[in-house]
Amino acid sequence: MKINGNLNIDSPVDNKNVAIVRSRNQMFFKAFQVAPNIWIVPERYYGESLKINEDQKFDGGIYDSNFLSTNNEKDDFLQATIKLLQRINNNVVGAKLLSLISTAIPFPYENNTEDYRQTNYLSSKNNEHYYTANLVIFGPGSNIIKNNVIYYKKEYAESGMGTMLEIWFQPFLTHKYDEFYVDPALELIKCLIKSLYYLYGIKPNDNLNIPYRLRNEFNSLEYSELNMIDFLISGGIDYKLLNTNPYWFIDKYFIDTSKNFEKYKNDYEIKIKNNNYIANSIKLYLEQKFKINVKDIWELNLSYFSKEFQIMMPERYNNALNHYYRKEFYVIDYFKNYNINGFKNGQIKTKLPLSKYNKEIINKPELIVNLINQNNTVLMKSNIYGDGLKGTVDNFYSNYIIPYNLNYEHSINYFYLDNVNIEEIEKIPPINDEDIYPYRKNADTFIPVYNITKAKEINTTTPLPVNYLQAQMIDSNDINLSSDFLKVISSKGSLVYSFLNNTMDYLEFIKYDKPIDTDKKYYKWLKAIFRNYSLDITETQEISNQFGDTKIIPWIGRALNILNTNNSFVEEFKNLGPISLINKKENITIPKIKIDEIPSSMLNFSFKDLSENLFNIYCKNNFYLKKIYYNFLDQWWTQYYSQYFDLICMASKSVLAQEKLIKKLIQKQLRYLMENSNISSTNLILINLTTTNTLRDISNQSQIAINNIDKFFNNAAMCVFENNIYPKFTSFMEQCIKNINKSTKEFILKCTNINETEKSHLIMQNSFSNLDFDFLDIQNMKNLFNLYTELLIKEQTSPYELSLYAFQEQDNNVIGDTSGKNTLVEYPKDIGLVYGINNNAIHLTGANQNIKFTNDYFENGLTNNFSIYFWLRNLKQNTIKSKLIGSKEDNCGWEIYFENDGLVFNIIDSNGNEKNIYLSNISNKSWHYIVISINRLKDQLLIFIDNILVANEDIKEILNIYSSDIISLLSDNNNVYIEGLSVLNKTINSNEILTDYFSDLNNSYIRNFDEEILQYNRTYELFNYVFPEIAINKIEQNNNIYLSINNENNLNFKPLKFKLLNTNPNKQYVQKWDEVIFSVLDGTEKYLDISTTNNRIQLVDNKNNAQIFIINNDIFISNCLTLTYNNVNVYLSIKNQDYNWVICDLNHDIPKKSYLWILKNI
């Protein structure tokens, strides 16, 4: 799909890609065709008045009649929308989506017999020109933050015929969900998917809604319902869980829609395909359209596209809505912040300015909670905002009878857009002006809908979670924390509520200390604030009760006033269990079922006919029982889990509120320091940078807390299902099974045309047992739930900030980083590569060889944990200091260097506090696994060598180690191999090191023929890969003993027995790059040497004369090995003097397989 990016607001009208077109209400606009049949009109949507009454304005909306009124704004809109379309088109599935929209022209209207008229067109002023249009993208309507998709004609949108459509779209304003910005490309994709429902004529009825959640915030039982299109398009957890063959998908919509679409597909074949009066291009477009099945459209959802585009999105529809909090909007500059790959710095790291419109957001809560005292005086008003969904008091489950005779119609195939052929579509010629015969009545009159609501109010004397949440929010920069809720709400804004006990204790403890007016004092204060906040917000506690062992979050009670009687959350949770966390506890409705009786007409059937018919009934009953299961599952998801999910949302917001308070305290202290100290400007810049990094680290700790919240409430929800719902389900199911078995048995016993043996066989064959149903095993349910309820709240970035790789190309060596952090890697061309423990290792030999890795993730500071690990092989003695790896600037940071035949790790802060750890001799030419882990919360430095903890140092006095964004790997006159250099943004524990160490080692071990690890001092026979059945033996010639093979089956030749010896007598297993000596057991012990006369391998008596070989495995054949001496391979020669000799020399004519050797157990 080609996107026309060469358009601007001043592009001249050519009546092809730029035209003045008529709208449905006879207004005229300048329109731009940016792709076949896809147009952009950079104007506000004409169907809504830009000036509306206050009562017509939506909650959370923004209204500005002047938005998008100047030519500059209109051009910006045009360019932004084009860029988003280019971004979508830049991905294969996005290009397929746009191609599909381009081809999905509505079926022509049959005006008279063989007289077909187009309904998808735009017209010029005097109807002189017509332009094919499937969709037209406008700016927003009256509410400038609302995106919408409007069909031209409802009848065509629902009948299978299809209709063109209009999109209202706002590209400039976005909002955050938790820590990431919502990508406008995904918002546009949502509109584009929805447009396919209209173009294909498969729009569901407006009343087809899905039970979505029980509204926990109301006293009465009220429900939210999700429109079918929004449900299908959103995807995510709801779609996965509720789409496991859900019973409500057995709806006439899915049956009728498929039939309607097939009707028009058939009409195309009969009436259109060979109609000479219809333009060929129209027929080609329709042919492409009907290659797509309706089910292909139903399968398209945002979850799929978000993964294909690597865009973060909320995994529950409810997550994206205004609920308990207000969105803040940010402005996107498409030249500075965005390109065809998305946000230039990612959805988290991009920094967007807040919109000026945030002060103009319409505030219309759905519910106002008045906290009153015993005198009915209002102490506090808290707002709860709508979730944007249709509300109802009808309990869907109490009225719904599970259908017995309707089959499940919709299944997910996961073959997304496989039938869309972009290349074929691009070859379709455009539909010309003269090809269009317009049908004038192609559009309904657009009538805007305004949601006029009035807030409900409730009074409560017990503070609700929303009251506690509101008390934690403050706009003032003058912050004083208090753990006394009543004192806070009585303070008229001078206090803010906090449950961070350690943090408040620390602030109280230092309240009367001397002013913080030096960088060192500030660093110590900042570090203490960070540590105490981390301890508070990530606190968990293991408990055991009748519901099992679980990890709870003690502060939840204090944060949201849940089970908070005298701060006894832990005890009350122990006693009452997870069901006590929610308000509405008895919601399960026993499903209404209706199972048909077995027809009496079958009583006289023969055994064969009866078997077949009873089997069909058995299958139908089996499926019906599954429908009952999904009914229970849906009820739990919508009525119980939705309440726990509300608690997840509120608790997460509480964490973010506390984080905001702490950050304001830090910023306040930083301002004081800058205004009241004599610190140099250079140090102030450093303090600012360090504070920024600490604020980032605080956000990371908050994310850990949010993850804890997620796990805690999800586990609680699962526990409620297991203990409160599942027993009712199993009891009901067992009774259903018992009744079905009973009626089946009674019927069979009445049958007159079969004998007793046949009756017994049929009864056994058509009776159910509990073992027939996986869902009667609670563990299967747990597995399903755990699979679907890991909520994606924040970008799950890799902990790796550097992950070194190296490989050889034809003309040069390539070194790079696989961490995904956009690291700049600079290195000289003379850097060598050798094969290391698992992969290529970098060989540093020359003076001042330097590899530089640059990215801003390397900037350490005061509070961030990090780890460094790598494999190291040192080939040289180092008596004087020689640098190896480091990240230092102005003598601040960390580095690793050689000195006195050992390795030294040095860390030094900006105040000169320093720690040096000397590691014992590692110059024995062996590979060593080095791990260095810095834990700033525990003030702990751990160093491991080969899985052994060699250093455990206190680094309490080390403060700010802010250094540059560069890590250097250099050769300061070293001779070393480095493999797998990695830097992580977290600590590494001993178990992780153990796993990684032995995983690497396991891959580094040399294997024998049976894939077993080779061992030193163990006896083997040696074979060459070319002759894998003929062992190496000895040949005596000219007073020398050489190695060869017995290629004449001479029984006098006996295979030699070999042992591998290592220079380190304590080493047991053979690894790659080991230096080995071969011992040969031939009467007396002999050793392998290389003849200086002919380069043959010969036997010598003295071990001191033996040659030391380097042993390696073959990359492609794991049970083969190679042997080298001075980088020259040992191989089996071609036949010479009747023998194939074992030789070590440079012979380039020898096949590579001759270099491969095999050791077999004896």
Curated annotation (Swiss-Prot):
Task: Kindly state a single biological-process term from the GO annotations of this entry.
Answer: proteolysis
Question: SUPFAM superfamilies in the record, alphabetically?
Answer: Clostridium neurotoxins, 'coiled-coil' domain, Concanavalin A-like lectins/glucanases, Metalloproteases ('zincins'), catalytic domain
Q: What are the recorded GO MF terms, alphabetically?
A: metalloendopeptidase activity; zinc ion binding
Q: What are the UniProt keywords, alphabetically?
A: Virulence
Q: Which cysteines are joined by disulfide bonds?
A: none
The keyword Hydrolase is annotated on this UniProt entry: no
Q: Which Pfam families does the entry link to?
A: NTNH_C, Peptidase_M27, Toxin_BN_H, Toxin_R_bind_N
Q: Could you name the Gene Ontology cellular component terms for this entry?
A: extracellular region
Q: Which family does the record claim for this protein? A: Belongs to the botulism non-toxic nonhemagglutinin family.
Q: How does it assemble?
A: Forms a highly interlocked heterodimer with botulinum neurotoxin type E at pH 6.0 but not at pH 7.5.
Q: What functional role does this protein have?
A: Assembles with botulinum neurotoxin type E (BoNT/E) and protects it against pH-mediated inactivation or protease activity at pH 2.6 (the pH of the animal gastrointestinal tract) but not at pH 6.0. The non-toxic component is necessary to maintain toxicity.
Report what the protein is called: Non-toxic nonhemagglutinin type E
- Name of the gene this protein is made from: ent-120
